[in-house]
């Protein structure tokens, strides 16, 4: 009977195990307020108290990060000058595909029209004009993410940032260099200023980062609702750096966890991270509120006494209550046990539905670009990526999904609108239950969201009234898009997969917001494109109405005309294609091993340049 009871009890544990991890030694945690906010720690004693709370919560899984010294950079010449060249200035050139026009983002390919910088196993400086005589003129023996503004090339490698003067690209000169003293997370470049986020896998204060002291007044810690986990093991350093001098002009630190998202407008930097519910506490709260419904008085009273005992942490309470329930179940006849289990499961699912918006949060820090003043707020759910946040007319719009693979049928999608103080003033919740967001794009006072389960709903959402967002239209088609790109004339392109898993390009017409349409589509017999996860791989050329899409060793070029998608060029390389750019009327496509130059008027190959000793498995930091 005991064995059989334990076996039946395992089904109850299946419910509970959805909301629990490994049992760790845990002391009682001092709870925060009933809301999320970031506050400066302000004193050593406050910091030590916070650090002890975190260490007790996550089982001391904190380690001290390392600082890496810079290595010497070698700059080598590769090609001598040729007398057949003629000097020419570009009429137009492409910029990196970014989220916010005018706010640059780091990538592996950059141009200012006169030179191209391509980061692979090394940084290649290429003279692109005239196209027939294009050549590699310098190699820099490092690699990383790049910015190229006027004649300044910034390289963010795995352990440092280096700024080069490339006014004479045959003789680039180092202007300044600094150690990252942590791991690179993300960055933006705006108005001659670099905004940088670095992660340190430790919690420590005060911090001196590149001679800038971050004291207790600039070290921000979270205050959380009691039911949320204190799983913080990381410090994020957010800095403003003058790109001319390399001077750190301002810097703050925020304690967070590993999953973060960065979005920057021209006024504010938004730094968001996922806040997970303490899943044991959720179950304990359910039992504390409902134990009288399922158990006799002595069992229910014991459960409540254990929960209310402040001498034990949640893990210890969870173990004791589990054993108490197991003993009670062992005493019941089989049918009664089964009925009780079924009722517990049904009631807990209803409880979860009632508290669904509390299941997970995204904490958001808003950092003013000028003053570095910090404000904070929260929304329910988690973000897909940086396109899930957008600032417009003083409001922050956020798209989230609540739930994960364990709750596929319960997942919901939401839009939240926050004011300048990050208070929620409007929301639209419960969208497309059982699906999750695959793509989102905010454009003006509208949002376009793609969710997916079996079909691809494209939702058009009106955000004109921030306090009352509403769905205007919906389109359901097979497959899904992971990236949406507006191309004007009420059209945008969706890059994703069809229902058979093959790459699909959709052309959407949103001239009738109440009735969006997929006016054309194009399928490729491939499974993957870098643009699925990295929108920097996508390029739109407005002059020729063409877009570039890489897939494996192919650089595909498509033209959009008369609501139709037409492939105009399949530029095949020897290795995986990564990026493209245009200068004047020429398209430059880049793979791991070579660069091709195509004439956009006839799509003929004008020039091919090979890269030596390329990385066979892709680019990366040394």
Curated annotation (Swiss-Prot):
Claim: ATP-binding is one of the keywords in the record: no
Protein's UniProt keywords contain Signal: yes
Keywords: Signal
PROSITE patterns: PROKAR_LIPOPROTEIN
One Pfam family here: Beta_propel
Signal peptide: 1-20
InterPro entries: Beta_propeller_containing, Quino_amine_DH_bsu, UCP006425_b-propeller
Designated name of the protein: Uncharacterized protein MJ1554
Organism per entry: Methanocaldococcus jannaschii (strain ATCC 43067 / DSM 2661 / JAL-1 / JCM 10045 / NBRC 100440)
């Amino acid at each position: 009977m005991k064995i059989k009871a334990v076996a039946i009890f395992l089904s109850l544990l299946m419910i509970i195990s959805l909301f629990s991890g490994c049992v760790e030694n845990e002391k009682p945690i001092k709870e925060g307020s009933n809301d999320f906010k970031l506050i400066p720690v302000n004193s050593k004693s406050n910091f030590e108290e916070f650090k002890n709370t975190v260490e007790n919560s996550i089982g001391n899984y904190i380690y001290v990060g390392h600082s890496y010294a810079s290595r010497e950079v070698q700059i080598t010449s590769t090609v001598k000058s040729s007398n057949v060249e003629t000097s020419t200035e570009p009429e137009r050139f492409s910029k990196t595909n970014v989220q916010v026009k005018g706010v640059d983002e780091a990538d592996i390919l950059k141009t200012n029209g006169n030179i191209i910088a391509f980061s692979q196993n090394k940084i290649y400086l290429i003279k692109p004009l005239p196209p027939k005589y294009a050549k590699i003129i310098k190699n820099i023996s490092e690699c990383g993410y790049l910015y190229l503004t006027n004649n300044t090339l910034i390289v963010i490698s795995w352990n440092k940032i280096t700024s080069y003067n490339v006014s004479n690209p045959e003789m680039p000169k180092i202007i300044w260099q600094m150690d990252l003293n942590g791991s690179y997370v993300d960055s933006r470049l705006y108005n001659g200023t670099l905004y940088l986020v670095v992660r340190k896998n430790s919690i420590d204060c005060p911090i001196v980062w590149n001679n800038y002291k971050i004291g207790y007044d600039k070290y921000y810690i979270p205050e959380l609702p009691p039911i949320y986990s204190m799983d913080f093991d990381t410090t994020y350093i957010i800095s403003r750096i003058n790109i001319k001098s390399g001077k750190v002009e301002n810097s703050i630190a925020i304690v967070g966890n590993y999953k973060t998202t960065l979005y920057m407008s021209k006024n504010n930097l938004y730094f968001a991270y996922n806040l997970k519910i303490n899943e044991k506490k959720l179950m304990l709260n359910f039992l504390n509120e409902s134990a009288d419904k399922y158990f006799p008085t002595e069992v229910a009273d014991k459960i409540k006494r254990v929960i209310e005992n402040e001498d034990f942490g949640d893990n210890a309470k969870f173990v004791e209550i589990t054993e108490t329930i197991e003993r009670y179940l062992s005493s019941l006849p089989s049918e009664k046990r089964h009925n009780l289990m079924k009722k517990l499961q049904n009631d807990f699912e209803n409880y979860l539905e009632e508290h669904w918006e509390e299941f997970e949060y995204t904490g958001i820090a808003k950092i003013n670009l000028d003053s570095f003043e910090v404000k904070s707020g929260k929304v329910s759910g988690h973000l897909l990526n940086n396109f899930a946040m957008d600032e417009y007319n003083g409001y922050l719009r956020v798209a989230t999904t609540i739930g994960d693979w364990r709750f596929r049928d319960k997942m919901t999608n939401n839009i939240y609108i926050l004011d300048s103080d990050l208070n929620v003033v409007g929301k639209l919740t419960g969208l497309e239950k059982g699906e999750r967001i695959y793509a989102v794009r905010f454009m003006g006072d509208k949002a376009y969201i793609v969710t997916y389960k079996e079909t691809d709903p494209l939702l058009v959402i009106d955000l004109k009234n921030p306090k009352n967002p509403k769905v205007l239209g919906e389109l359901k088609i097979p497959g899904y898009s992971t990236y949406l790109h507006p191309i004007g004339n009420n059209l945008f392109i969706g890059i994703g997969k069809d229902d058979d898993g093959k790459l699909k390009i959709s052309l959407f017409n949103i001239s009738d917001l109440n009735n969006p349409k997929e006016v054309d589509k194009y399928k490729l017999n491939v499974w993957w494109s870098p643009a699925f996860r990295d929108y920097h791989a996508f390029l739109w050329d407005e002059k020729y109405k063409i877009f570039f899409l890489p897939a494996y060793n192919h650089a595909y070029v498509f033209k959009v005309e008369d609501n139709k998608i037409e492939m105009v060029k399949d530029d095949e390389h020897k290795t995986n294609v990564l990026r493209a750019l245009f200068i004047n009327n020429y398209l430059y496509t880049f793979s791991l091993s070579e660069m091709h130059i195509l004439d956009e008027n006839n799509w003929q190959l004008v020039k091919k340049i090979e890269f030596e000793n390329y990385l066979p498995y892709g680019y990366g930091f040394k």
